């Protein structure tokens, strides 16, 4: 038996936990900041899509993107699956703007895709994708610049490589590339295929970038290192080289970096 008078008198107490943003959310925040800083506006599209999207994007019949999660009680066929690729919503938004006679449109989206598991009892793999889409006063290289700015902001200091043999059906065959960082594919970039552009009623050259933030998160770091001031003044030298058009600039940079030199600026003089 416990007597009330034997319970000691104390003041109420409790502990608080300081809230913080997760590392993954920090990466997303940086992606949004970089996109907005470079002139992109945020788009928000549905995660529900129609199976007709796959044909609209010219995806192969055996494409992994066709293995979608089917909704058991959809609102209709147009909302009957969960998206496996983020570009349909982006292209639909760009198409709406183009049809409203907006001549210079740059959009970005941070949204999940849902990759179905082979085991139907398991939940799908949800991956956040950073998607950029634009037409008008934009080209392949300006989109490439946004990619590199984002990677640098999240501590990925090495320059990404661009593999032109991407083989993405909805991008222009000669104007697309996988984005490779330290040997790992983190996304892709390119100009929209003309046939797909017609499917979305886009009459301008349209450019897309898709970066898998789930992959990028494992490589990113917000740690900063500072180097001491050099004892001696820097020495710079301008070097000009004449090369065939078939030589990729990235390969030239690799050779220079292997020799221990830092490339400050490369210009294409014709």
Labelled PLM ranges:
Residues 72-74, 103, 107-137:
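Polyanion/phosphate-binding surface patch
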Residues 48, 114, 216:
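Hydrophobic pocket-lining residues within nucleotide cofactor-binding pockets
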Residues 4-9, 16, 119-120, 125-126, ...:
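A carboxyl-terminal module marker
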Residues 22, 26-33, 38-39, 43, ...:
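Generic recognition of stable, solvent-exposed alpha-helical segments in well-folded globular domains
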Residues 4-103, 268-270:
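Extended, well-folded interaction surfaces typified by the phenylalanyl-tRNA synthetase beta subunit core
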Residues 37-41, 92-96, 100, 116, ...:
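Short, well-ordered loop/turn and helix-capping segments at boundaries between secondary-structure elements
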Residues 77, 97, 117, 195-197:
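Short beta-strands and strand-coil junctions in structured, solvent-facing domains, enriched
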């Amino acid at each position: 038996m416990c007597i009330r008078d034997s319970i000691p008198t104390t003041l109420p107490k409790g502990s608080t936990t300081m809230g913080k943003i997760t590392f993954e959310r920090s990466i997303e925040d940086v992606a949004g900041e970089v996109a907005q800083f470079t002139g992109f506006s945020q788009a928000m599209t549905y995660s529900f899509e129609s199976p007709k999207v796959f044909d609209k994007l010219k995806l192969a019949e055996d494409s992994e993107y066709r293995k979608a999660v089917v909704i058991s009680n959809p609102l209709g066929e147009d909302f009957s699956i969960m998206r496996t690729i983020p570009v349909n919503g982006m292209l639909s938004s760009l198409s709406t703007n183009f049809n409203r006679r907006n001549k210079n449109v740059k959009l970005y989206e941070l949204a999940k895709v849902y990759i179905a598991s082979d085991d139907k009892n398991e939940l799908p793999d949800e991956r956040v994708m950073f998607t950029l889409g634009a037409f008008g006063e934009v080209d392949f290289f300006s989109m490439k610049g946004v990619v590199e700015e984002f990677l640098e902001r999240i501590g990925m200091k090495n320059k990404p490589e661009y593999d032109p043999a991407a083989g993405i059906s909805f991008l222009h065959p000669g104007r697309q590339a996988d984005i490779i960082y330290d040997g790992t594919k983190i996304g892709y970039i390119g100009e929209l295929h003309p046939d797909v552009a017609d499917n979305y009623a886009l009459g301008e050259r349209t450019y897309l970038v898709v970066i898998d933030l789930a992959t990028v998160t494992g490589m990113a770091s917000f740690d900063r290192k500072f180097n001491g001031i050099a004892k001696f003044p820097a020495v710079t030298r301008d070097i000009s080289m004449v090369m065939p058009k078939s030589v990729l600039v990235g390969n030239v940079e690799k050779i220079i970096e292997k020799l221990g030199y830092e490339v400050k600026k490369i210009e294409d003089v014709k």
